[in-house]
Amino acid sequence: MDKLRVLYDEFVTISKDNLERETGLSASDVDMDFDLNIFMTLVPVLEKKVCAITPTIEDDKIVTMMKYCSYQSFSFWFLKSGAVVKSVYNKLDDVEKEKFVATFRDMLLNVQTLISLNSMYTRLRQDTEDIVSDSKKIMEIVSHLRASTTENAAYQVLQQNNSFIISTLNKILSDENYLLKIIAVFDSKLISEKETLNEYKQLYTISSESLVYGIRCVSNLDISSVQLSNNKYVLFVKKMLPKIILFQNNDINAQQFANVISKIYTLIYRQLTSNVDVGCLLTDTIESAKTKISVEKIKQTGINNVQSLIKFISDNKKEYKTIISEEYLSKEDRIITILQDIVNEHDIKYDNKLLNMRDLIVTFRERYSYKF
């Protein structure tokens, strides 16, 4: 919203200066909210008349769109004259024209994002009842699993809730905003503050294409040195995954994916329980974090359920993001070395090549760390 405000101010300043000079009339007071509503109405019309508005849209298409934007619709020039945005563009020199086109394009793109947020905002409210029901059921299943004392008892819990688990996974994987909606149930800021919604949207929105790509990458990992554990949990996952629509529609080998996930789980458990280097890393991290996190503050907050935990994290997000970032960056080389040793020991390959953990982690950090 801040970026849109800056772009809007630039657009208004250039427009007012030129309109007042050309007509001799004085501009009215600016009402940004009023004008944004006009732009939100205009964007779908412009896309229908000219073309889709994308970051790569050509300059001449933007100029064409200017012909369909009349200033008399906006607060600062309401019903004053029939000038269109292109008439101001025509009066500018080449450098100013280039800047004006860029400003107008970026403003339309940001308005487009605002339209999307408004739509999601409406759906979040509409979907709350179903999501509350799903969330309660999920927590109930987790509670029963934690209370299970044997593998057979846990397997029975999963079997009894098989239909719900499959239908919920299908909902989650077919709706890129489903995770966001679940968080909204526990963090009311997503409903009341659109800027918070936009921030969370960037973090927790996952496209189907990204999911499919990630699943294929995991499925193609070669972890043949780790023995497959065909316990009842793995058998349940193997029975369930073929019923997931995302797997069906994208011809993903559910059995192969389940096998790799089982091996990864086995490997992680083994490292956490027997790898001395991993144990030392975790201990050092916890001890370091204790010096930066106020346990007393957490106790005073009175965290006693998922909702209060999510609210606490949300309210202190910036502080904890900084702590996590500092902890990770100070230990990145050590983490990479430990992971590469594990890869080397178990001969973990992708595309017939030994995984290079430094390349993988650094690439991920450079591409996606801005989200966190």
UniProtKB/Swiss-Prot annotation:
Keywords: Host cytoplasm, Virion. This is Virion morphogenesis protein OPG132. Its main location: host cell. The lineage of its organism: Viruses, Varidnaviria, Bamfordvirae, Nucleocytoviricota, Pokkesviricetes. It is found in: Host cytoplasm; Virion. Changing Y204A: About 50% decrease in lipid binding and causes severe defects in viral replication. It holds the Pfam family Pox_A6. Lipid-bound viral membrane assembly protein that plays an essential role in immature virion (IV) to mature virion (MV) transition. Functions in both crescent-shaped viral membranes formation and its enclosure to form immature virions. In addition, participates in targeting mature virion proteins to sites of virion assembly to ensure their proper localization. It comes from Vaccinia virus (strain Copenhagen) (VACV). The N-terminal domain is not required for crescent formation but is required for virion formation. GO terms for cellular component: host cell cytoplasm; virion component. Belongs to the orthopoxvirus OPG132 family. InterPro entries: Poxvirus_A6 (IPR007008).
